[in-house]
Amino acid sequence: MNLTLLATEGFGLNFNLFETNILNWAVVVFGLYKFLPGFLGKMLQKRREGILLELKDAEDRLLNATQALEKAKKDLSSAAEKASQIKADSLKRSESIRMESEKKAIEEMARIKQSAISDESSEASRAISQLRKEAVELAIKKALDSLPNRLDKTTQENLVTQSINNIEVN
């Protein structure tokens, strides 16, 4: 359109149906009114069914997840109780093992001490026995050395008779 022409003629309404495309608009609006609800309705219905199906699926997953969470919580509390029980049992067991090992160590120390005492005592008794033996041998040697000088014939006969009598008594 020409701008100069519009400026000179002014603003007005055109009532010519064929020039204004009112019929075209009426056909388009009628067609949309008649056919669009069926086509668009089917699309919206499918979309609605899809959304409802997805919502139901999401609710089912939520329910399953909630049930799994509850089961996991129960399992966790059960595992925690079992772990605390195992810990308590292991503490008791370790304490009993420690006490038992301390008892064995004390018994072993007592046995070693007793062994040392008995070794010392047997060593002492061996030494005493050795000293006695040496003292007896020394006394016998001294007696034998001094005996020929002190023993005469009658004393020797009395000694032999006395020894024979002692042997017969025993």
Swiss-Prot record:
| Chain residue ranges for the region called Disordered | 76-98
Bias regions of kind Basic and acidic residues — which residues? Answer: 89-98
Give any Gene Ontology cellular component.
plasma membrane-derived thylakoid membrane
- One Pfam family cited in the UniProt record for this chain: ATP-synt_B
Q: How does it sit in the membrane?
A: Single-pass membrane protein
- Location, primary (coarse class): membrane
Taxonomically, the superkingdom here is: Bacteria
Residues that span the membrane, as ranges: 22-41
- Cell location: Cellular thylakoid membrane
Alphabetic keyword roster: ATP synthesis, CF(0), Hydrogen ion transport, Ion transport, Membrane, Thylakoid, Transmembrane, Transmembrane helix, Transport
One example of the protein's molecular function in GO is: proton-transporting ATP synthase activity, rotational mechanism
Q: Note the NCBIfam families from the entry.
A: PRK07352.1
Q: Please give the family membership noted in the entry.
A: Belongs to the ATPase B chain family.
Q: What does this protein do?
A: F(1)F(0) ATP synthase produces ATP from ADP in the presence of a proton or sodium gradient. F-type ATPases consist of two structural domains, F(1) containing the extramembraneous catalytic core and F(0) containing the membrane proton channel, linked together by a central stalk and a peripheral stalk. During catalysis, ATP synthesis in the catalytic domain of F(1) is coupled via a rotary mechanism of the central stalk subunits to proton translocation.
Q: What is this protein called?
A: ATP synthase subunit b
